[in-house]
């Protein structure tokens, strides 16, 4: 059966996450339903990352096996036609070798978290950023973030129910971009690693927000990391500011 990789964009707001749910809308379920309208099913797709409820994606990757050969351009177009009016888009499709696996072949995942500092409620970005009503110190947040880059035991920064075999991960990059706007300042956290623990990004950003607000010192981030205790973590940031922006492979399947 021919295998295809799909690059996917979605607004996570209406969905109970990526993973198929019995009685709730999911991104996986929406795409599998669309595939079933192209070819007899059942269809099961596998993704590089299983995003949680409310988390968005601009560069999710999944793969599926189909019965017949499809022109990738036509496959993407046909799926998009059947996905309407849901906020899900197949940005690209590509024929890939049968050994390609969206999750297990991945060597890098990239996330963006958008944090907006302004007193007024957000309007155009409602559901797409985390807004806090107080100013933040970006240099303090950068100093705190520096403690987290590299290979560490991230027990403090993972969900209590995380099923990963080990809490040790290598965070390859954690950078902070400041975007000044007429109606507020947006802080964009860019994170890159081979893989992440459940709630790791949201736990990190929630903790760094406390540093930016002056409630924590940058050195307290290191103390929390060294504690290897979930109770030492700062607040977990809400999901709506988080985006899966890209997945890296040894060879780009869409090139």
From Swiss-Prot:
It comes from the Bacteria. GO terms for biological process: tRNA pseudouridine synthesis. Formation of pseudouridine at positions 38, 39 and 40 in the anticodon stem and loop of transfer RNAs. HAMAP family: TruA. Homodimer. Coiled coil: none annotated. Its EC number is 5.4.99.12. This is tRNA pseudouridine synthase A. Signal peptide: none annotated. The gene is truA.
């Amino acid at each position: 059966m021919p295998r295809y990789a799909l690059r996917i964009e979605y607004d996570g707001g209406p969905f109970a996450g990526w993973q198929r749910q019995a009685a709730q809308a999911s991104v996986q379920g929406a795409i599998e339903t669309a595939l079933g309208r192209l070819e007899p099913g059942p269809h099961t797709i596998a993704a590089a990352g299983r995003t949680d409820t409310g988390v968005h994606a601009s560069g999710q990757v999944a793969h599926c096996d189909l019965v017949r050969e499809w022109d990738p351009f036509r496959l993407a177009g046909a799926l998009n036609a059947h996905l309407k009016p849901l906020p899900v888009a197949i940005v690209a499709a590509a024929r890939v070798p049968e050994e390609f696996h969206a999750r297990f072949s991945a060597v890098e995942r990239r996330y963006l978290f958008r944090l907006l500092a302004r007193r007024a409620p957000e309007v155009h970005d409602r559901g797409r950023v985390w807004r806090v009503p107080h100013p933040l110190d970006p240099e303090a947040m950068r100093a705190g973030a520096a403690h987290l880059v590299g290979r560490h035991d991230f027990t403090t920064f993972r969900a209590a129910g995380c099923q990963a075999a080990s809490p040790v991960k290598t965070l390859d990059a954690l950078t902070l971009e400041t975007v000044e706007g007429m109606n507020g300042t947006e802080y964009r956290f860019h994170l890159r690693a081979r893989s992440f623990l459940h709630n790791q990004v949201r736990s990190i950003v929630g903790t760094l927000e406390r540093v930016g607000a002056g409630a924590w010192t940058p050195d307290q981030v290191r103390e929390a990391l060294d504690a290897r205790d979930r109770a030492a973590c700062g607040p977990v940031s809400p999901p709506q500011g988080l985006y899966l922006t890209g997945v890296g492979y040894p060879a780009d399947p869409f090139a």
